[in-house]
Amino acid sequence: MRLEGRVAIVTGAAHGIGRAICVELAREGAAVWACDVRAAELEGTRAAVESVAPGACRTAVVDVRDAAAVGAFVARVDAASGRIDGLVNTAGGVAGQVMRPVEEVPDADWREIFAVNLDGAFHFTRAAAPLMKRAGRGAIVNISSGAGRSYSLTGIQAYASAKAGLIGFTRQTARELGRHGIRVNSVAPGFIRSNPASERQWDAMGADGQARLVESIALHRLGTPEEIARAVVFFVSDDAAFVTGQTTSVDGGQWMLG
């Protein structure tokens, strides 16, 4: 197993892509600390991990927007485990918002999406970096989006902008932390039916819109949360020991960006 003895934190772990990441990390031998704001759904994640790796998952309710809560959680993981080898910043989403003309977007809605999608990754990276520096190694993976590399199918300006910011944050921290043996990369999923928000978006497309979306993907199908998770495992593992500062699209060839 590629991650035997490693300890990893996964944010946004209550369902969908975050849950799949927890399962795949544990399958490869990692001890996983899963956090989210949804306590009940976190129990589902714990059960999913337990089914493949008994005893490999601990959960905690943490709001990534709350810097103090993030710092306390990271300190708790360090106290219990003595190390943090991997950090996967999955928390994100559109915060229940829908597309509106840019002139109608309130400041509070703009900031809310940035708080979840970008500030949260900053809070966790800031808290975990000293511990990884102490160890002389570490791997951080930020879950961005095709929206951050092109545009958002949701039409939500703040979402595309925050995900683009997360890609920039990935590059900058990779440059800064590389001398300490810490790698920072990003995985940019395409459209994945992984949670209630993506299901609502899928339903809103209608049959014709769904067909057009699938037709735009080179592999002519949607991806799965597990396929995103396997890319994350690669970046956390030593298979990616000489890879940092990169954003990899896992979208079935929808965008094919250089």
PLM regions: where:
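Active-site helix of classical SDR
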Residues: 125, 162, 170
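A glycine/serine/threonine-rich, flexible loop-to-helix segment
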Residues: 179, 191-217, 257-258
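Alpha-helical segment proximal to the catalytic Tyr-Lys
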Residues: 130, 149, 175-176, 241
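Short, small/polar-rich loop/turn modules that mediate ligand/substrate recognition or access, typified
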Residues: 178, 183, 243-245
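Canonical Rossmann dinucleotide-binding motif of NAD(H)/NADP(H)-dependent dehydrogenases/reductases
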Residues: 3-33
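Short C-terminal tail/terminal secondary-structure segment
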Residues: 94, 99, 233, 244-258
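Substrate-binding pocket helix/loop in short-chain dehydrogenase/reductase
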Residues: 98-102, 106-114, 202, 213
